[in-house]
């Protein structure tokens, strides 16, 4: 018999359902996924579909990037790359069918962080409406793809908000050019104790990342069931 040992992970969407994340927690997610993208870069791979549904969490609270079903290896010429991914997190150059590179992943990760720091809403979606319609989403997509600058995410402090907006800049040349530069910007803010956004919840302390108690309980239950 052949046995394959794999790390047990659970979908980010399941573990964090109903939990408001702090800046520190969202920053940890960003830093962990930047490291994932750094490794992708070493293998010359573009993920092309970074979104909350493709993020996973380990029993130790580390964030992982999964679902490489439409990932593609970088080539010397990018002209043959296809328009793949999820429109809600797609970079403008990919949406327009133009040549693109690994900076589309930086853009998508920036949008993930934006959503987590903006009442779980992507740019240009009304924060006051309880129900977001298909037309709302289409209008928001149109504004984003037209080059309109998104407002800062409401739950992020000024420094963190600036980093997020730079990551999801309309022009790829204005983004962080590599995942390590994105990660370094996040680590710099974390090192100097970022200010909380006006709506953010205060939770945890010290320099480490303290996971919400509800999340700890979910992880423990899942791991016990898995090993039973």
PLM features per residue range, with description:
Residues 35-45:
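Protein kinase catalytic-loop region centered on the HRD/HxD motif
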Residues 80-93:
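Conserved activation segment of eukaryotic-like protein kinases, specifically the C-terminal portion
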Residues 105:
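Conserved catalytic-loop aspartate of Hanks-type protein kinases
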Residues 175:
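Conserved HRD-motif arginine in the catalytic loop of eukaryotic-like protein kinases
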């Amino acid at each position: 018999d052949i046995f394959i040992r794999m790390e047990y992970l659970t979908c980010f969407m399941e573990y964090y359902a109903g939990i408001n994340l702090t800046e520190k927690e969202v920053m940890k997610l960003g830093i962990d996924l930047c490291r994932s993208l750094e490794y992708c870069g070493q293998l010359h791979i573009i993920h092309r579909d970074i979104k909350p549904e493709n993020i996973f969490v380990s029993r130790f609270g580390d964030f992982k990037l999964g679902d490489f079903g439409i990932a593609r290896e970088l080539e010397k010429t990018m002209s043959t790359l296809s328009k793949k991914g999820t429109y809600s997190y797609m970079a403008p150059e990919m949406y327009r069918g133009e040549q693109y590179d690994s900076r589309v992943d930086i853009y998508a990760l920036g949008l993930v962080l934006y959503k987590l720091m903006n009442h779980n809403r992507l740019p240009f979606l009304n924060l006051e409406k309880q129900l977001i319609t298909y037309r709302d989403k289409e209008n928001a997509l149109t504004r984003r793809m037209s080059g309109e600058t998104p407002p800062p995410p409401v739950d992020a402090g000024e420094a963190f908000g600036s980093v997020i907006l730079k990551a999801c800049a309309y022009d790829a040349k204005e983004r962080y050019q590599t995942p390590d530069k994105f990660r370094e910007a996040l680590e710099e803010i974390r090192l100097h104790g970022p200010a909380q956004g006006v709506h953010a919840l205060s939770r945890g302390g010290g320099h480490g990342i303290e996971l919400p108690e509800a999340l700890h309980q979910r992880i423990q239950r899942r791991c016990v069931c898995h090993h039973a």
